[in-house]
Amino acid sequence: MAAHVEQLEFQAEARQLLDLMIHSVYSNKDSFLRELVSNASDALDKLRLESFRNKDLDVDTSDLHIEIDVDKEARTLTVRDNGIGMTRDEVVSLIGTLAKSGTGELRQQLREAKDKDTSEELIGQFGIGFYASFMVADRVELLTRKAGESEATRWESSGEGTYTIETVDQAGGEVPQGTSVTLHLKPEDREDELHDYTSEWKIRELVKQYSDFIAWPIRMEVERRTPAPEDGGEESVTVETETLNSMKALWARPRDEVSDEEYTEFYKHVAHAWDEPLEVIAMKAEGTFEYQALLFIPSHAPFDLFNQNAAVGVQLYVKRVFIMGDCDQLMPPYLRFVKGVVDAQDMSLNVSREILQQDRQIRAIRRRLTKKVLSTITEMQTERPEKYRTFWTQFGRVLKEGLLTDIENQETLLRVCSFASTHSEDEPTTLAEYVERMPDGQSQIFYAAGESRQQLLHSPHLEAFKAKGYEVLLLTDPVDEVWVESVHEFDGKPLQSVAKGEVDLDSDADNDGQDAERQEREQGFADLIAWLKEALSDHVKEVRLSTRLTDSPACLITDTFGITPALARMYRASGQPVPVEKRILELNPNHPLITGLREAHKSRGADAELVGTAELLYGTALLAEGGVLEDPARFAGLLADRLTRTVGDQT
């Protein structure tokens, strides 16, 4: 008996996805079966794990399997499992809506999806392969019962913006544990690549192509016809249940026996992805800790790449028995984009996430996997540069997080990272390449950190470096502000910010001849510097002449060991208290504004108008580096007053 029937609307993002499906933007409609079988396999994995963890769960796990049923007359295809099942709330959460972070980004990407290849990537990125059913079906029914629960749930939709959901009374026990998905198939249409999905041979073909490696048996009832005997009688028809997949663990097979297509399909299964892997990493370890691993570096970044709490895509097996999906103890957070499987031969099965964190074998496996992934990236960098460029574009920002957290592999990470620089507008550089290009006399690796390349190229801090022809790394990712504080050198060359500390780009010979000139210049500006330090005491802790400016009148810098404003903002945004730190104002002694200000101060003293000019000087220096004014209204007022006087002087 059914009760509690509701008709609900799909969430906006879900409606957009359905529209993509129904209007056939996908090039390969056959992949719907892979998605349904993959979901069924996940449900069986979850039930096996839950029965292991929860001894009070009274379920039979002796014959876990997936069934495929077809009805040629009704033109239906059903994929059924006896796995974990779902409650009514879980059905609404997982199917009626997209209960995931990043739905706003999904909405934007759906709007921007102009072609089928772009659209195809969205399914895998947002983990919503169930919707692929609507590529081949006019109507989809789902019937499910959660393991250990008495109530079952029926869900149905034709993909037109609404769905119905009802609770099914289990008094008669008519709904078995698990989930069945029934597709009411669209008419066969070869031009639209809609095949006959009730055909036994088509189902066999798709299971072999997409799901042969699934660890659970995929069964289907098939008819077997026996010809009539020669001495008379009729042809006999029997129905047999066949297992369609080999269930061979792909990671246990030698690499030369596995085709690229098999690796690709396995990657799509474990990663719930639609793109192809950029790199395949197969490894086998023997000795103290025996394990096999099959890892993949994707070719596209997932939407939640920069969410450090996002699920890690490495599954843990022990002796080919699924133990845990998204095992974050197997891969450091900065490699969270890596997908795949690790199969250990000897590990305690009494596992929990807390125990795993303390497991010596898990730590050893993680260390080896990390080194293997980094060595693969290094090989890409040196031997397959096109692949490396793709990798760096997609995952470079997150890989740099390892410079902060993985001290053991920091040197390797420094060598594998790439950075924009003033050397080339298009091609990034490695630190090793930067060092090779350093001219005689340069002993430091110079870098500038900011929000964008354009902002940094116009920063006053770069002026002297441009004049000297020194290359400067342009660091524009938020993580750059953090890792440069903990990495002090590369290949014996110190890293030096162009916006911190004192900069002296002259050679020793030049310095010997310029010391007297410099002292004389400092004496000539001593009064102005002392007055500006007092007038701007609320903003700066020191005023001095600059050796880094050639065109701008002034700039702001931070002490050698001080915290930059951008880093301070990041810390405050994360809730960490950071004291306000005054900075240093450097003046360009050759700029007409500075020499004019010196003469005006000599003749007029510290009048109110000059104080306003000093504030404008500080404000323009702050704006030139992309900073934020403390009192924009006052700055605007002072500027308007100066502009008014300029116009008035010319009338």
UniProtKB/Swiss-Prot annotation:
InterPro entries: HATPase_C_sf, HSP90_C, Hsp90_fam, Hsp90_N, Ribosomal_Su5_D2-typ_SF. It comes from Mycolicibacterium vanbaalenii (strain DSM 7251 / JCM 13017 / BCRC 16820 / KCTC 9966 / NRRL B-24157 / PYR-1) (Mycobacterium vanbaalenii). Belongs to the heat shock protein 90 family. The gene is htpG. Residues 1-353 are annotated as: A. Molecular chaperone. Has ATPase activity. Homodimer. It is found in: Cytoplasm. Gene3D superfamilies: 3.30.230.80, 3.40.50.11260, Heat shock protein 90, C-terminal domain (1.20.120.790), Histidine kinase-like ATPase, C-terminal domain (3.30.565.10). The keyword Transferase does not apply. This is Chaperone protein HtpG. Residues 570-651 are annotated as: C. HAMAP family: HSP90 (MF_00505). PANTHER family: HEAT SHOCK PROTEIN 90 FAMILY MEMBER (PTHR11528). Keywords: ATP-binding, Chaperone, Cytoplasm, Nucleotide-binding, Stress response. Its main location: cytoplasm. Residues 354-569 are annotated as: B. GO terms for cellular component: cytoplasm. It comes from the Bacteria. NCBIfam families: PRK05218.1. GO terms for molecular function: ATP binding; ATP hydrolysis activity; ATP-dependent protein folding chaperone; unfolded protein binding.
